[in-house]
């Protein structure tokens, strides 16, 4: 039976990779809805190729632009805009599968709506679990939704774990691998001089700018630890992080009998996306087969928390519980945005997040409204801290 997809965040890197896989298997997958924020021209191109029933954008001006271009091209795709439209296409009867690929907290509401509608959810928006893990997982369970992780690390763990949840007691721990990003060996004293372009040059993966910065600070790995805690139901002390610069082993599961299972593959997001789209079957993802004979080295090292303070902050937030993870994520989003706009330096990202976590009293949320209130308060505090921060160093020229 053909799966009907709503693709949240279709113009980003995950969206591109998803549509590449979809295009390879038109007999298996079709598109009900595509969504973007402001990249209207790219959304138009996607709509003309995949002919969704609905397209959603962030605002009325972008909607008018997209609709005009689609009508001129003879497309009948309905164009909607705004947060409620994202929720509507996520819970619509027109789709059975929702690919949640919106970056940041903006992806929470539509992802949660998909869970409450009992959809098959391919989760690439880790913020949904970082912000509201208990609420989200309760919705998945209570409404019979199916959650399939798309992040390469979590998808790798999913593939290495037993299908029967009753057998999870045999697991000792899970190990998330990390490339270490572009600054794994850079002198720590020079990190204050890092530019946005340098931070966005990931050594192995092709990603959007925000997640590239998160990878450079290793905040991304910290968020993934929190995500893994909720998806797999393991305490933080049973989730390890290991730097693996080659990005060939995507994660591992260690069992009590001494066995360690790992998932390997070329670093290409189409592999975990194809796995989740077709699960429990396997389909061609368009990715080259891994040639083990060509791999010169597989190396591993423990993370340096002095070099990567954001990772330490994320682990601390998981340990503290309450609203700490939501505040961590919100402060980080504001700080990364400021860094990309060159309003703060690279090391100020961690400093801003730390200051917000220290300033915001932790508490247990009673529901989604409490989570969203904590998110808003953390963003306000982060913006205030950044406004008072000294200007970053001027980029050196040769």
From Swiss-Prot:
Q: Which Gene3D superfamilies match?
A: 1.10.1740.10, NAD(P)-binding Rossmann-like Domain
Q: In which pathway does it act?
A: Isoprenoid biosynthesis; isopentenyl diphosphate biosynthesis via DXP pathway; isopentenyl diphosphate from 1-deoxy-D-xylulose 5-phosphate: step 1/6
Catalytic activity, EC: 1.1.1.267
Kindly list the positions annotated as binding Mn(2+).
Answer: 151, 153, 224
Q: Where is NADPH bound in this sequence? A: 11-14, 38-39, 125, 127, 208
- HAMAP family hit by this protein: DXP_reductoisom
- Protein name as it appears in the record: 1-deoxy-D-xylulose 5-phosphate reductoisomerase
The encoding gene is: dxr
